Amino acid sequence: MADGSSLLFRLHLEGVDIGSRADDQAKAWRKHSDDFVSLFYDGHHCFTSLLAGDRAANEKLLDNMREFIAGDRKGWNKEVTAKVGVPLVEGITAFADGDYDKSVDLLQPIMSDVLTMIPVKKKSWN
């Protein structure tokens, strides 16, 4: 799902009319709004929901992330969701809303963490 979502987002950023193609992707992501398996996937879920115009799914993802980090779980996933995941989703959302200053303010401090999550970037280091 991540590859399809990424392609749609890149095409959208290039000005290509993707029509309703993001709708099916967003629908598939909705099933994973509380998985917290990977921030890489959470980011894709976020921008695909926004591309499809599904603000409710994006807000649910963000609410679930906040609930996850507020809970009594311990460990790396909770810490990285708090440090990187929530700002990542908030930053993507701000970008989609056209609030570029806010997007930069949220994303700039976590960029080095975000870059370590990108599989293509990891492959290019080898």
For each feature predicted by the language model, list its residue ranges.
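Long, internal scaffold/assembly segments composed of regular secondary structure
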Residues: 1-31
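Structural motif corresponding to the intra-repeat A-B loop/turn of tetratricopeptide repeats
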Residues: 11-14, 52, 97
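"A position-specific structural signal for the A-helix of alpha-solenoid helical repeats
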Residues: 3-10, 43-44, 48-51, 84-92, ...
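Non-catalytic interaction/regulatory modules that flank or connect domains
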Residues: 38-41, 49-61
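TPR-repeat structural position
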Residues: 16-19, 55, 100
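Long, positively charged binding patches that form subdomain-scale interaction surfaces
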Residues: 55-58, 65-68, 80-88, 95-97
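Solenoid-like repeat scaffolds
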Residues: 25-39, 63-80, 108-120
